[in-house]
Swiss-Prot record:
Coiled coil: none annotated. This is Glutamyl-tRNA(Gln) amidotransferase subunit A. It comes from Wolbachia sp. subsp. Brugia malayi (strain TRS). Signal peptide: none annotated. GO terms for cellular component: glutamyl-tRNA(Gln) amidotransferase complex.
Length: 489
């Protein structure tokens, strides 16, 4: 029965439709895997919710076999612990919200559950989505299913959606919800050898998603194939009047556009992404995939995105400033942790000192400094101006090209026991942050293995609201590259 865990979402759906196996059988084998997992990917398990969804799915499939049944009906999924789930603990992996149980459902998880998906539980993450390795969780780090060949060293899964990526790579679930602020879906997907996609900013509602940086936060998905990502994205995207930034643009059936035809498409390669610190192995695969796309009929051209070098400092200034504002609500008064004290101000201070982890405190301090009266113009306003320039670089580039091909991360995953400097950690996001600042859709696709036997990935960036075309290009890359997803013994 463990073979069921290795099926794609589409294969699971076909098996359920043909009654080759029941949804209850499918879910039970995944529940058993989750109960025995050693990756620390799941922090809250919801087997009762999953079995209930499976029984409902079996009833639907026994009564109806037409195309009106959702492709996610009865499919085992995980939800990043950043999305509020009604009646199920939602912590953002912080001591501050250790015992918080929401009274409402986030829009994207609600859409997923209404499609019939079976939620196996809530997934580990960096605290309040602040991190690039999933080592900043109150509930402990997540382990990657892949290990270094030379020494058997465990490696990080990436972050902040490390639990989402590790659970999918480890065949604990077929797909997972994640969030992407500066690359938190794409970078862990790259490290874990799976597919991670974020849509255009505004495609998915942010209602019920615990805020980190509101102008950057966007829901995304992690799966084991591009076609599976398309199925999940078309389920969770759509207008929501509860989110003022939600787009009213119609959402096409993304999966219908995956046909492998990219003839005449212009693919841009930005020269600024060939920077110091990028591994030779990444460069090799970048050039190889570019050549493959040419053979498939695409035109590959050099482009320039001149303000790329400012993306990392601009991103960390803006996201830290927004985080300092968003996290001001955690004061021990309304909900979450409270540390009692005789004086109100002391209660605020003690609560936040105990409730927040080191990385969250660091970013709050950076953000508060950037927003302070003496530095607002010097830092925050300038960062917003340069963000506009970065966005304009992309707009100008897309006047002449259709898609952009860049690495997802500069290197393979680093060791779990390594303790890199926070500044070094920032560099891990160097290739994902620009698309986030511009609000563009992007997808990370595994393209091969390093000499250490660890996954390497490239990223396709699409124009605004062109997720369908982006997914199609990604599917061609996926087909051209040898399949690297396997259970790592």
């Amino acid at each position: 029965m463990n073979e069921l865990r290795k099926l794609s979402i589409a294969q699971m759906h076909n098996g359920l439709k043909q009654r080759s196996f029941s949804a209850v059988e499918l879910i039970e084998v995944h529940i058993n895997a989750v109960e025995n997992e050693k990756l620390n990917a799941f922090i809250t398990k919801t087997p009762e919710i999953a079995i209930k969804a499976a029984k409902t799915a079996d009833e639907r499939f026994s009564q109806q076999k037409d195309s009106t049944i959702s492709p996610l009906m009865g499919i085992p999924v995980g939800v990043k612990d950043l999305f509020c789930t009604k009646g199920v603990k939602t912590t953002a992996c912080s001591k501050m919200l250790e015992n918080f149980i929401p009274t409402y459902e986030s829009t994207v998880s609600d859409l997923l559950l209404k499609s019939g998906a079976a939620m196996l539980g809530k997934l580990n993450m960096d605290e309040f989505a602040m991190g690039s390795a999933n080592i900043n969780s109150y509930f402990g780090p997540v382990e990657n299913v892949w290990v270094r060949k030379s020494d058997g060293e465990k490696v990080v899964p990436g972050g902040s959606s490390g639990g989402s990526a590790a659970s999918v790579a480890g065949f604990l679930c077929a797909g997972a919800l994640g969030s992407d602020t500066g690359g938190s879906v794409r970078q862990p997907a790259a490290y874990c050898g799976v597919v991670g996609a974020k849509p255009t900013y505004g495609r998915c509602s942010r209602f019920g998603m615990i805020a980190f940086a509101s102008s950057l936060d966007q829901a995304g998905v992690i799966t084991r194939s591009v076609s599976d990502s398309a199925l999940m994205l078309e389920t969770i995207c759509g207008y929501d009047n509860k989110d003022s930034t939600s787009s009213e643009r119609p959402v096409p059936r993304f999966s219908n556009f995956i046909n492998g035809d990219i003839k005449g498409r212009r693919i841009g390669i930005p020269k600024e992404y060939r920077m110091d610190g990028i591994s030779e192995e990444i460069i090799y695969h970048w050039e190889k995939v570019s050549s493959d796309l040419k053979e498939n009929g695409a035109e590959v051209v050099d482009i320039t995105l001149p303000h790329t070098k400012y993306a990392i400092p601009v991103y960390y200034l803006i996201c830290s400033a927004e985080a300092s504002s968003n996290l001001a609500r955690y004061d021990g008064v309304r909900y979450g942790l409270r540390v009692n004290a005789d004086i109100l101000e002391e209660m605020y201070s003690l609560t936040r000192a105990e409730g927040f982890g080191k990385e969250v405190k660091r970013r709050i301090l950076i953000g508060a400094y950037a927003l302070s009266s003496g530095h607002y113009n010097e830092y925050y306003e300038k960062a917003q101006c340069i963000r506009a320039l970065i966005r304009n670089d992309f707009i100008k580039a897309f006047e002449k090209i259709d898609y952009i091909l860049v690495p997802s991360a500069p290197t393979e995953a680093f060791g779990l026991n390594e303790k890199p400097d926070p500044l070094i950690m920032c560099i891990n996001d160097v290739f994902t942050v620009p698309a986030s600042l511009a609000g563009l859709p992007a997808i990370s696709v595994p393209v091969g293995l390093s000499n250490e036997g660890l996954p390497l990935a490239l990223q396709v960036i699409g124009n605004y609201y062109d997720e369908a075309g982006m997914l199609n290009v990604a599917s061609v890359i996926e087909q051209n590259c040898s399949r690297i997803i396997k259970l790592n013994s």
